[in-house]
Amino acid sequence: MNFEQTHRDALTEVLRWRRDVRHFRPDPIDEAVIDRLRAVMDMAPSVGNARPWRVIRVDSPALRAEVLANFNAARAAAGSAYAGEQAEAYATLKLQGIDQAPLQLAVFTHRDPAAGHGLGRASMPVTLQQSTAMAFTRSGCRAGENLGLGMVSVLDPKAVERLLNAPPDWDFVAWLCIGVPEFTDDTPLLHRAGWQENLPTEWERR
């Protein structure tokens, strides 16, 4: 298929309005929309076609509450690295949507999946994690569904694995919060908050 300028423009807009958000409305997401997000993840490439990502949809309020407690403990521990004005700024940042997002996914990487028969990963096992990252970033079409997504990284991964009773060969990668944003913005939250501005990607040539 050859794509036209209208396709390119539409994709650029979806990517620009990436909606990496932390503030969600509680509106439930239609199951048909969730099915489309899953289908887009299924289209992702992976090393050796191993498809190492594993996803647990977490609907239980009790489990979400425990993950939020995990976050609060990890956030407090991480905050000890900052002092003065930076510590004050850190305290004001909203770094999770666990308390609001209607759809929450725990994403894991299978450390040694049978699929793919080891192709392409013997010398670079990290390609399994890279494949998982490509899979859940494919859900970037969420902006096209008028949804936002926030990845929560301030967590104790081993505690999440225990909490969700993940198999021992699954490594926790990401906690994804998905829902309709409270507001839309094409500027990353940390840039707007003054914590870290968006920087251009540096390319070098050899």
Curated annotation (Swiss-Prot):
InterPro entries: BluB (IPR012825), Nitroreductase (IPR029479), Nitroreductase-like (IPR000415), Nitroreductase/BluB (IPR050627)
Assigned protein family: Belongs to the BluB family.
Protein name in the entry: 5,6-dimethylbenzimidazole synthase
Domain of life: Bacteria
Its biological purpose: Involved in the biosynthesis of cobalamin (vitamin B12). Catalyzes the oxidative fragmentation and contraction of the isoalloxazine heterocycle and the cleavage of the ribityl tail of FMNH(2) to form 5,6-dimethylbenzimidazole (DMB) and D-erythrose 4-phosphate (E4P). NAD(P)H is only required initially to reduce FMN and oxygen drives the oxidative fragmentation.
GO biological process: cobalamin biosynthetic process
Binding site for FMN: 18-22, 46, 95, 153
Enzyme Commission identifier(s): 1.13.11.79
Reactions catalysed, as given in the entry: FMNH2 + O2 = dialurate + 5,6-dimethylbenzimidazole + D-erythrose 4-phosphate + H(+)
Organism lineage string: Bacteria, Pseudomonadati, Pseudomonadota, Alphaproteobacteria, Rhodobacterales
GO molecular function: 5,6-dimethylbenzimidazole synthase activity; nucleotide binding; oxidoreductase activity, acting on paired donors, with incorporation or reduction of molecular oxygen
Keyword ATP-binding: no
Keyword Cytoplasm: no
Keywords tagged on the record: Cobalamin biosynthesis, Flavoprotein, FMN, NAD, NADP, Nucleotide-binding, Oxidoreductase
